[in-house]
């Protein structure tokens, strides 16, 4: 990992993404695979491209991502957060624009734990009146 990379760490649910960006042609590689192969749904690709499209940097950077934990949606959100932070590391003047779109803020929503005596976090056992 030698060279002039800009780095950003992104988190979402239980997923953590380490994002490295450098000047290039717009390739996005996630865990050694092209992004369109790694994310099976189109929504995942759309989510990770949002900060790049907002700042008009879609074909400006080559992006290398290591992401682990969570599912596909959480990983896409973590990658988006990491790309946003890496873009701010590259050029701090992009922060107000990215912040206004809500990409800088870490989405703090986590899965609520299951409670004792309930079927799920809030779902109680079925009640029978008779």
From Swiss-Prot:
InterPro entries given in the database record: Ribosomal_Su5_D2-typ_SF (IPR020568), Ribosomal_uS9 (IPR000754), Ribosomal_uS9_bac/plastid (IPR023035), Ribosomal_uS9_CS (IPR020574), Ribsml_uS5_D2-typ_fold_subgr (IPR014721)
Molecular function terms from GO: RNA binding; structural constituent of ribosome
Keywords from the named record: Ribonucleoprotein, Ribosomal protein
Transmembrane segments: none
Family matches, as Pfam families: Ribosomal_S9
Superkingdom field: Bacteria
One of the protein's GO biological processes: translation
Gene3D superfamilies in alphabetical order: 3.30.230.10
SUPFAM superfamilies assigned to the protein according to its UniProt record, in alphabetical order: Ribosomal protein S5 domain 2-like
A GO cellular-component term linked to this record: cytosolic small ribosomal subunit
Sequence similarity: Belongs to the universal ribosomal protein uS9 family.
Protein name: Small ribosomal subunit protein uS9
Lineage, highest ranks first: Bacteria, Pseudomonadati, Pseudomonadota, Betaproteobacteria, Burkholderiales
């Amino acid at each position: 990992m030698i060279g002039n990379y800009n780095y950003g760490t992104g988190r979402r649910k239980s997923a953590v993404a380490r994002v490295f960006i450098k000047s290039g042609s717009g390739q996005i590689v996630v865990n050694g695979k092209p992004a369109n192969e790694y994310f099976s749904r189109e929504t995942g690709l759309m989510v990770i491209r949002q900060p790049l499209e907002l700042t008009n940097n879609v074909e400006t950077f080559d992006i290398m991502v290591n992401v682990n934990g969570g599912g596909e949606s959480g990983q896409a959100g973590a990658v988006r957060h990491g790309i946003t932070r890496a873009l701010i590391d590259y050029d701090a003047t992009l922060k107000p624009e990215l912040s206004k779109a809500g990409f800088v803020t870490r989405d703090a929503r986590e899965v609520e734990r299951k409670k004792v005596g309930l079927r799920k976090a809030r779902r109680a056992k079925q009640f029978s009146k008779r």
